[in-house]
C-alpha cells in the first residue's frame, strides 16, 4: 500500500468516515464510510467510491442510480481520521431517498418548546424510479 494511505487513522474495522461536499456550493451532501480500497480507487478514478457496512462491499456511488460523484479534491482532517471529498454530484441527487442531500431533516422547536425533526428538502425523484425496486 502507498504511504499516503498509511497516514489515515483507520478505525478498528479498517474504516474512516468520508464527507461528500459539493465543490461549487460547499453544501454537505452525504457522509459514508471508506476502507483503504475505496479511498485508493477514489483517488485513482476520480469517482466517489465508499464501503457499504450493511452489504460489506465496495459501493461505487451512482453504479445503480446513475448519480455518480466526480471527485475534484480529497482532503484529510487535522486528526487524520476523517476524509473530505469535494465533488460534483451528477444528476443532482446524492441521497438514496431521492433528495439532493442526505441532510434533509431539520430540528425545529414549536412555541411550547417541543422539538421534532422535519423534512425540509423536497424529493427530486421517487427512489422506486431511481433503483427500479
From Swiss-Prot:
Binding site for Zn(2+): 78, 95, 102
Residues spanning the membrane: none
Reactions that this protein is recorded to catalyse: 1-(5-phospho-beta-D-ribosyl)-5'-AMP + H2O = 1-(5-phospho-beta-D-ribosyl)-5-[(5-phospho-beta-D-ribosylamino)methylideneamino]imidazole-4-carboxamide
SUPFAM superfamilies: HisI-like (SSF141734)
Gene Ontology, cellular component aspect: cytoplasm
Keywords recorded for this protein, A-Z: Amino-acid biosynthesis, Cytoplasm, Histidine biosynthesis, Hydrolase, Magnesium, Metal-binding, Zinc
Top enzyme category: hydrolase
Subcellular location: Cytoplasm
Gene Ontology molecular function: magnesium ion binding; phosphoribosyl-AMP cyclohydrolase activity; zinc ion binding
GO BP, sorted A to Z: L-histidine biosynthetic process
InterPro entries in the record: PRA-CH, PRib_AMP_CycHydrolase_dom, PRib_AMP_CycHydrolase_sf
Main location: cytoplasm
Record note on cofactor: Binds 1 Mg(2+) ion per subunit. Binds 1 zinc ion per subunit.
Stated family: Belongs to the PRA-CH family.
NCBIfam families (UniProt xref): PRK00051.1 (NF000768)
Protein name: Phosphoribosyl-AMP cyclohydrolase
Organism: Thiobacillus denitrificans (strain ATCC 25259 / T1)
Lineage: Bacteria, Pseudomonadati, Pseudomonadota, Betaproteobacteria, Nitrosomonadales
